[in-house]
Structure formats: C-alpha cells, structure tokens
Amino acid sequence: MQIIARKNKNYFLWEGFLNGDYCLCYTTEILEEYEEILCLKTNRLIATIVLEIITQAPNTKRIDAHYHWNLITQDPDDNKFVDCAVFANADFIVSDDKHFKELENIDFPRVLVIKLEEFARLYRNIDIN
C-alpha cells in the first residue's frame, strides 16, 4: 500500500495499476487489512476511495480463497496473501515482509515472492504497449 503515496519513489507502480498495466488480486480479508492500514496512515475517506478504486478497476480480480494453506507459521495473518495468490494462480506476491521468506522452503504449492524494488525493476523493463 505504500505505493499510493505520491511522494513515494514507487508511486509510478500505482499509476501503472491505475492505467491497467497489471492485475491485482484480492480477497475480502486483504481488503480489510488494506482498509485498516490506510485508516491508520491516512484517514477513512482516503481508505474508502482507494478500496473503491481497487474493487472497481477492470484489472483486479476478486478471489474466493475457500481453502487455507497455512504455509506461513511466523505470522499466520500473512497467509491471506498466500491463499489469494494460490487461488488466483498469480505470478508472484510483491512484499518486503520477512515472514514470506518461509515460502522459499515450500515446494507445494509453490508461491513466488518478490520484493517491491524487484517488482519496480521488472515493471520498468516491460514494454506495456
């Protein structure tokens, strides 16, 4: 969520999302966490606007993660992102959270995690046109 701040060096990634350059997958649990974080860091109005953008954008996919893999043990709350990625058949999760490192040792289901800076590099090198 840090990329939505205009002053953030990776704001161009949010602009890319708004332009439809990549797909964002989410579950209800993920939206609830985003709302909580955005309300703490900004205010309720901004949180509502951002969530509305995410849920209404044509390049988002709402996922019903009806099974919980429970792959991350150090911070089980992070599993909502893993479950979403598995059911969405996502290419990867973008996160700098150290708890996702546990996934490197799990063969099935295989979930790739890349850091925000790596995603920014990949995004810069993709010809969107």
Feature roles, as predicted:
Residues 1-26:
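Short, well-structured N-terminal submotif of metal-dependent ribonuclease cores
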Residues 22, 60, 91, 109-111:
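A structural micro-motif
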Residues 98-129:
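Acidic, PIN/NYN-like endoribonuclease modules and their adjacent C-terminal/linker elements
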Residues 59-93, 98, 102:
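Active-site neighborhoods of divalent-metal-dependent phosphate/nucleic-acid chemistry enzymes
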Residues 18-21, 25-68:
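PIN-domain endoribonuclease scaffold, especially VapC-family toxins
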Residues 16, 54, 84, 105:
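Hydrophobic/aromatic ligand-binding patch that stacks against planar heteroaromatic rings
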Residues 4, 38, 104-107:
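Short, flexible helix/strand-to-coil boundary loops that buttress conserved ligand/catalytic motifs
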Residues 32-33, 68-72, 118-124:
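A short acidic, often aromatic-flanked loop/helix-cap motif at beta-alpha or helix-coil junctions
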